[in-house]
A protein has these predicted regions:
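Bacterial N-terminal signal peptides that target proteins for export
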Residues: 1-11
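Bacterial N-terminal signal peptides
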Residues: 11-18
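N-terminal signal peptide c-region/cleavage motif recognized by signal peptidases
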Residues: 20-22
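N-terminal small/polar-rich segments of proteins
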Residues: 24-120, 126, 136-185
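Active-site-proximal mixed secondary-structure blocks
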Residues: 130-134
Length: 185
């Protein structure tokens, strides 16, 4: 019987040892350390053009002297909530000599016309935020609301030179620089 008791105790001891989970040490945590994160999305407005040259074959005294190609101005923006609108402008630096032959003969901005997105042709006769006085045209105005703080728009421009006001314009090569620029206000 003693032997059975010893065997019983031994079995109990073995079962207890097998079922006992080893004790873990006390959990010790460090102090929390933080990381400050800063992410900046800057405001931006950009204009890209599908081409940068237009040629004209002029007919003396003619109202219809179309440009060789249309140009698309793609305006892209990312703006703050305080911005209310985005305008796109076309302008020359001087209204009296939008195009010149370099010998004193000029084509004024009032004789240069743009049709924007299939609309009527308009001369560049307005004073806009850029360029010379009476040498510009507002192509578009986009209200900036909560749903378009980031966006893109296209302005497809066709060009014409009206030579009716210049019946005595001498033959020559006339060059000029038209600038397209956007403004967010």
């Amino acid at each position: 019987m003693k032997r059975n008791v010893k065997l019983g105790w031994l079995m109990t001891l073995l079962m207890t040892a097998a079922l006992t989970v080893p004790a873990r040490g006390q959990v010790l945590n460090s102090a929390a350390s933080t990381i400050t994160l800063n992410a900046v999305l800057s405001q931006s407005v950009s204009v890209t053009l599908s081409a940068n040259a237009v040629n004209f074959t002029l007919t003396s005294g003619s109202a219809n002297n179309p440009g060789s190609t249309s140009i698309t101005a793609t305006t892209t923006w990312t703006l703050k909530p305080s911005v209310g609108s985005l305008q796109v402008y076309a302008f020359f630096s001087n209204s009296a000599s939008a195009l010149t032959d370099g010998a004193g003969n000029n084509i004024a901005s009032a004789d240069f016309q743009i049709s924007n997105n299939g609309g009527a042709f308009n001369a560049l006769t307005n004073t806009v935020p850029f360029g010379g006085a009476n040498a510009g045209l507002q192509l578009s105005s986009t209200p900036i609301l909560g749903n378009n703080r980031t966006g893109t728009r296209n302005d497809v421009m066709n060009f014409n030179i009206n030579l009716v006001p210049l019946p005595n314009l001498p033959a020559g090569t006339y060059t000029g620089t038209l600038t397209i620029q956007a403004q967010a206000i």
